[in-house]
């Protein structure tokens, strides 16, 4: 199964404290850490009846459009990725070596054996969410099963909170069909038409 997990307001939800601690654990220190700490320690004021109230700290959000934000988000997300890679209960496919996930922006493309692993995956994401602020948006997430077994498909469908994509799933602009022989028609031909327009 492939699960494309969409984050709920990915950049907006990351907790500053967790981000700074993660950077420190990864060996980022000195001037760079001080700059990040300063930029991501904003405060806000509310003006009520023309009177400025006491400032309060903003504790979450990596700034949209800020050049280091995608990198900072990826560094924070790597904590979850490492936990997934190291979790023995989460089974993965073998392509020369075990492949559990592929990360890009706020989507995690996760490839695994659903019957054994989905519960543990959701548990890890839930635990990570509590400390980092990262949450998944189930309506934005898709599961794609590479099986023609209807019984197995029904069982999996009942056990996961994601929408099931029946024929194909789109990842990084490429359509991944259920049948690999359709990959050329689904993606390559379509992309070539778009390029030649």
Language-model region placement:
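Nucleotidyl polymerases of mobile genetic elements and RNA viruses
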Residues: 1-197
């Amino acid at each position: 199964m492939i699960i494309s997990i969409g984050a709920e307001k990915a950049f907006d939800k990351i907790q500053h404290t967790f981000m700074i601690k993660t950077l420190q654990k990864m060996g980022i220190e000195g001037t760079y850490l001080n700059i990040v700490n300063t930029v991501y320690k904003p405060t806000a004021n509310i003006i009520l009846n023309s009177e400025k109230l006491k400032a309060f700290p903003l504790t979450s959000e990596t700034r949209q459009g800020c050049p280091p934000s995608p990198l900072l988000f990826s560094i924070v997300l790597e904590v979850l990725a490492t936990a997934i890679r190291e979790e023995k209960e989460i089974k993965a496919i073998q392509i020369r070596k075990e492949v559990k996930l592929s990360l890009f922006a706020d989507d995690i493309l996760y490839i695994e054996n659903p019957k054994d692993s989905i519960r543990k995956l959701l548990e890890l994401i839930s635990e990570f969410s509590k400390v980092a602020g990262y949450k998944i948006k189930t309506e934005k997430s898709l599961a794609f099963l590479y099986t023609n077994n209807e019984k197995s498909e029904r069982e999996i469908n009942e056990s996961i909170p994601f929408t099931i994509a029946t024929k194909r799933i789109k990842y990084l602009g490429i359509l991944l069909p259920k049948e690999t022989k359709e990959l050329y028609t689904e993606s390559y031909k379509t992309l070539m038409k778009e390029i030649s327009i």
